[in-house]
């Protein structure tokens, strides 16, 4: 019988820590690209919502869908065809959209 590969809690914590660092770094790098000089970190979703006649949550969900579909496709494809950098990028982008959604929801609750 083949020996199972396991990940310990300590190893998982390291994975989580590294992923959070990637997320924070990417969000910081992309800030200027998506907000320009605007102080509102969520302005891109508000503008997209206004253009589409919907709430910022829905605009963000539409943008996030592309990343989730890409990640889903990778999960169902031959795993060997994707290198670690590609996995890192897709996972990080997907998580970052969820973090941004959290901020949109928080702002909406504060306004309401």
Role assignments for model-derived ranges:
Residues 1-112:
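Intrinsically disordered, low-complexity regulatory regions
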């Amino acid at each position: 019988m083949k020996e199972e590969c396991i990940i310990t809690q300590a190893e998982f914590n390291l994975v989580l820590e590294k992923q959070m660092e990637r997320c924070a770094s990417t969000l910081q790098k992309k800030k200027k690209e998506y907000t320009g000089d605007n102080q509102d970190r969520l302005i891109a979703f508000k503008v997209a919502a206004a253009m589409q006649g919907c709430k910022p949550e829905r605009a963000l969900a539409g943008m996030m869908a592309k990343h989730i579909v890409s990640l889903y496709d990778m999960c169902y494809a031959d795993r060997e065809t994707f290198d670690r950098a590609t996995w890192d990028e897709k996972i990080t982008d997907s998580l970052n959209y969820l973090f941004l959604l959290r901020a949109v929801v928080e702002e909406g609750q504060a306004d309401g």
